[in-house]
A protein has these predicted regions:
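The N-terminal extracellular segments of secreted preproproteins, especially immediately downstream
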Residues: 28-29, 300
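Mid-domain alpha/beta scaffold segments of enzyme catalytic cores
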Residues: 39, 44-46, 51-52, 56-318
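Short hydrophobic targeting helices and cationic amphipathic motifs
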Residues: 3, 9, 13, 17-20, ...
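Short hydrophobic alpha-helical segments enriched in small aliphatic residues
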Residues: 23, 31-34, 42, 57
């Protein structure tokens, strides 16, 4: 309901502003416009907090709001408007964000963002495309970051065979090492797997990843592979790809996966959903993902938001 209220309120203000432009003009219009913007921001901040919505009083993000389980707000694509965008999320129903490290610098940046914003938490790890930078010293840096009170996962880590480099053997080595780190520090793991279904599963099974727990981010495989991950009690990160017309295999998998094993994600700034495909992505696009899942599941959008938030809090211990 709070998403509907937000949309209605913003559309009302848009029409009202057009009316005032014609009725007034010049400096008087500017003053009225500034007043409306202040009022709008205040009300949009309060709407998601109606009916006991808001912070849980424990500094763990806002409850009963959309939970963004995978974003990269440290990415340079956000350098021009990062603060403005992040400050606007609560007003659009986004309550909690997990910022994911893709390399050592990104992992450290994720921790800094988590320190700066109460609703942001960090995951630290090295993406398979970045493992050439890893070393024993790098693993020690990750281990130290895992001790931060706002780090809730190890990752993203895994295998990506879309490009020939880094070599598969090197990816496998550091994937296994990061799984071992997650087990050591008792944190869930964020898995990246592209065009590497069998090898990813083999390594996870060999290292008993089911005992570690985690999420397969940006899940893109068929429902048969989903069954394997369900057997390990893993969650599934579903993002903008679910809105693509050619995502038939993923849509069948999402219909098969229980709602209590799904997390909402964007992978911002990548993989924007329809109708913004190709543009920079952000958590503001999560309602499109929630709506697509709701349609496939035959439930309300709010039911998806509430279930996925509950799932994410369970996984990340928030």
């Amino acid at each position: 309901m709070f998403l509907v209220m937000q949309v209605f309120f913003k559309e009302f203000l848009r029409i009202f502003q057009f009316f005032l432009v014609f009725a007034f003009g010049g400096s008087r219009w500017y003053i009225i416009h500034r007043f409306i913007m202040i009022w709008k921001n205040a009300v949009l901040f309060l709407i998601p907090r109606l009916n006991n919505r808001g912070t849980d009083g424990k500094g763990k993000g806002a409850v009963n709001m959309i939970f963004e389980s995978h974003a990269h707000y440290d990415d340079e694509d956000f350098d021009t408007d990062r603060e403005e965008l992040l400050s606007s999320l609560a007003g659009h129903g986004i309550g909690t964000v997990i910022n994911i490290g893709a390399n050592l610098a990104g992992s450290e940046a994720s921790v800094k963002l988590a320190e700066q914003y109460p609703f942001i938490y960090g995951a630290v790890g090295v993406h398979p495309s970045e493992v050439e930078e890893l070393s024993e010293e790098g693993m020690e840096r990750l281990r130290a970051l895992c001790g931060h009170e706002k780090v809730v996962a190890v990752g993203e880590t895994g295998l990506d065979y879309h490009y020939p480099e880094p070599a598969a053997a090197l990816q496998k080595e550091w994937f296994a090492r990061q799984l071992a780190l997650a087990r050591e520090v008792k944190l869930p793991v964020v898995i990246h797997s592209r065009e590497a279904a069998k090898d990813t599963l083999d390594i996870m099974q060999a290292h008993r990843a089911g005992e570690i727990g985690g999420v397969v981010h940006c899940f893109s495989y068929a429902k048969e592979m989903a069954r394997e991950y369900l057997d390990m009690d893993f969650y599934f990160g579903i993002g903008g790809v679910i809105t693509f017309k050619n995502a038939k295999k993923l849509k069948e998998a999402v219909q098969y996966i229980p709602l209590d094993k799904i997390l909402l994600e964007t992978d911002s700034p990548y993989l924007s959903p329809e109708p913004h495909r190709g543009a920079r992505n952000s958590s503001l696009n999560l309602p499109y993902v929630a709506e697509a899942i709701a349609e496939l599941k035959g439930v309300s959008c709010e039911a998806v938001v509430e279930a996925t938030e509950r799932n994410a809090r369970r996984l990340f211990g928030l």
